Structure formats: C-alpha cells, structure tokens
Amino acid sequence: MLNKYHQQNVEVLYSKDSITAANQSDIEHFKQLSSHNLRKRIRLCAHLDQTDPLHEMLIVHEKSAYVRPHKHLGKSESTHIIEGLVDVVLFDNDGRIEQVISMGDYASGKTFYYRITTPIFHTLIIRSEVLVFHETTNGPFDIRATVFAPWAPEDADVNSVVDFMSDLDTQVSLI
C-alpha cells in the first residue's frame, strides 16, 4: 500500500495512480494512520491534485474527530458510508438544528448516502469507534469557499469543542 500514494501531510494522502483502487487492507492501514495523528482523521484523495474539477476522497475519522460545522459556497457534496455509524447534523445560519440524518453502511438499514446541493452548515457526530466514508465534491479546492460556523468552536479550543459536542449530542437525542 505504501507505494500507492504520497503523503501531503499527516491527514492527507494522494493517489499516485490514474486509477485509484482501495481494498479492506488499505482501509485498515488508513485506520492505523488516523489513530496516530492529533485530529484522528485521514483522507485518501483519488483526484490528482487540488485543481482537479472533481474531488473524490476515502476518509477515515475516529469517534473523537471533530468536524467544525461548515458550509461550502458554490459546491455540492455527497457522502457514502462504507463503515460505521454517524449522525449528520444540518444547521441554519444561526446554529439551530434543521435536520439530522442518521447514517450507516448499506447493511445497517440506515441512510447510507446523502448529497447537499446548497450551502448549509453541517457537522458529524460519529456514533461508532471508526467512520469510513467516500466523499465527493466539485473542485478546485479553494479554502475561501468553506465557511466555518461562527457559533462553533475552532478545532484548537479543545475544552469548548468537548462542551459543544456534548451539548449537540444532547440536542440531537431530543429530536
């Protein structure tokens, strides 16, 4: 597996091949890699680079991974669950929950695919020890097209993240 990609940083890998294929062994390797980085996540980008018009990624997040609520301007995003359980929480601009999509892999009987076509704040509450998913969005990557929710803590504010996620989990459990 090591010869199939190059590592951009501790969280991002790029495929070296024009045809990207992944198997169970690859996913297990990604799980190991995610467990050794601070934010407990890793992604394999199947697109060639950030300028590609289509971005496809295999992503692994551990349960403790925090995805700050965000939205994408001028982009759509789709997610297909490969392994694990997650609640996708969608918010209005003021941070009120609009919808929760409870997801799992196909065999779970839960929703296993969704697509967002409009800019809406969203985050993940990971319900399993590990979440593996395939995400597709249009490129090229432009950090300015990602808007982080001003009412949600930044990743580095660990205590506020713990409080925010605990409060969010309570709110979701009441829906």
Regions found by a protein language model. Give the residues of each.
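Double-stranded beta-helix
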Residues: 96-100, 106-108, 123-175
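Glycine- and acidic-residue-biased ligand/ion/polar-headgroup-sensing regions
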Residues: 74-94
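Short, charged/polar surface micro-motifs in flexible loops or helix N-caps
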Residues: 51-54, 62-66, 85-87, 94-96
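Extended, positively charged loop/linker patches that create polyanion-binding surfaces
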Residues: 74, 92-115
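Conserved short histidine dyad/triad with adjacent acidic residue
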Residues: 58-75, 118
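Short beta-strand His + acidic residue motifs that chelate non-heme Fe in jelly-roll/DSBH
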Residues: 68-70, 88-90, 114-116, 122-127, ...
